[in-house]
Amino acid sequence: MPLYTAIIQEGIVSVETEAKIAKEITRIHTSVMKVPKNFVRVVFLSYPKGSGFTGGEKATTAALNCVLRSGHTAEEKTDMLQQLWTMFQRLTGIATDQLALSLQEIPSSNAMEMGQIMQAVGHE
């Protein structure tokens, strides 16, 4: 169920690097949240050079957002965010002041996958 959306300026990372990022996101998410790897989905979106802004100024900014089921502990979320930050910055070279990560939790009853309403965390 977790859906990761990586938003980054076009040309910053190669298709090969996107594949590495997707594998690392999957590895991190499954090791921290204890879910099967086929639950993890990753999508890359790019924007044209000159179309990113930070503080109202043009910038090469990036974001990694994850929609996931609620029910994970604060410790799990903190651990995952820290690992994701380190990995994403290492593989993209994005400056610390240009990267934003977020987790957006939703009730499992608000998500479907494989034609089924998702179960609560811990009931996979």
Predicted stretch roles:
Residues M1-E124:
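Interaction-mediating elements
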